[in-house]
Curated annotation (Swiss-Prot):
This is Protoheme IX farnesyltransferase. The gene is ctaB. It comes from Bacillus pumilus (strain SAFR-032). It comes from the Bacteria. Gene3D superfamilies: UbiA prenyltransferase. It catalyses: heme b + (2E,6E)-farnesyl diphosphate + H2O = Fe(II)-heme o + diphosphate. Disulfide bonds: none annotated. Its EC number is 2.5.1.141.
């Protein structure tokens, strides 16, 4: 590991990409993750307004505090993750140009900045409801400590543990409005929790060699592709009943969710027939991204009519 890390460091420092401070900042906070969670947080909040009958425009203070606060804690958690993972990020093609790896942002700076963002975000969430702030803290702790610092490097169940943190944004949005969690909020949480596992296992198949080089015990690294495929199918199938608990949004959402789930399951089953595993995992990964966007945006749109 030490020799490979030394070689990687030499290669990286010899070919450091010229980037702006802004680009390094966006890489540090993993802006793609922040953006995707923005959608799910907003959906949870929007549906809370819809089901309670509260005015969206009449509560723009809650909207701004929730969206900015949740984005800050996610960005801060990602910065902490980048700082902690710099020793393994240097070994993977996908992550070797992150600013914490190239030295453009020092670990201490990343930790301090990440903690600052988390604290500011939690304060903003606390200005909405205590419940929202508590859930936000649970998300941060799960991602930064239970996932990043503990399970990621030791257990194949790391994906499941990390999925808890990725599932709390809809709960943050919902509880910022209501202060309580009801069935619809839990369904959004479960959709996000279950969705992440086949999503990230598909990515793990695509990046198996990267994870193997870094010594990260992802499921396909430890148990191979066939076991991973079966796990993907099982978790995808677990999504099937969830749309039926969203009947309050009308049958079109139930139908859309069911079709999306069946489509994903069919593509998953194709993995046992397709010879090109990488092509299949890419198809699964791309479908998962479209699944999330279509389903959550549709939940918002349906309430406008």
């Amino acid at each position: 590991m030490a020799n490979s890390k030394t070689a990687a460091e030499a290669a990286i420092h010899g070919q450091i990409e010229k980037t702006t401070a802004w680009k390094d900042f966006l890489a540090l906070i993993k802006m793609g993750i922040v953006n995707s969670n923005f959608i799910t947080t907003f959906t949870g909040m929007w549906l809370a307004f819809y089901f309670t009958g509260m005015s969206f425009l009449g509560n723009l203070d809650i909207v701004l505090l929730t969206m900015i606060g949740s984005s800050l804690i996610i960005a801060g958690s990602c910065a902490i993750n980048n700082a902690f993972d710099r020793d393994i990020d240097i070994l993977m093609e996908r992550t070797k140009t992150r600013p914490t790896v190239t030295g453009k942002i020092q670990p201490g700076q990343a930790y301090a900045f990440g903690i600052l963002l988390v604290v500011l975000g939690l304060i903003m969430l606390l200005m909405t409801t205590v419940t929202s702030a508590v859930i936000g803290f649970i998300g941060v702790f799960t991602y930064a400590v239970l996932y990043t610092m503990w399970s990621k490097r030791h257990y194949t169940i790391n994906t499941v543990i990390g999925s808890v943190s990725g599932a709390v944004p809809p709960l943050i949005g919902w509880t910022a409005v209501t202060g309580t969690i009801d069935t619809t909020a839990w369904v959004l949480f479960m959709i996000m929790f279950i969705w992440q596992i086949p999503h990230f296992l598909s990515l793990a198949i695509k990046k198996t060699e990267d994870y193997r080089k870094a010594g990260i015990p992802m499921l396909p690294v430890v148990y191979g592709f066939e076991v991973t495929k079966r796990q993907i199918i099982i978790w995808t199938a677990c999504l099937l009943p969830l749309p039926f608990f969203l009947g309050g949004l009308g049958w079109p959402i139930v139908a859309l969710g069911t079709l999306l789930n069946i489509g994903w399951l069919v593509i998953g089953l194709m993995g046992f027939k397709m010879k090109d595993v990488m092509k299949w995992s890419t198809l699964m990964f791309v479908y998962s991204l479209n699944y999330l966007t279509i389903f959550f945006v549709a939940m918002i749109i349906i309430t406008l009519f």
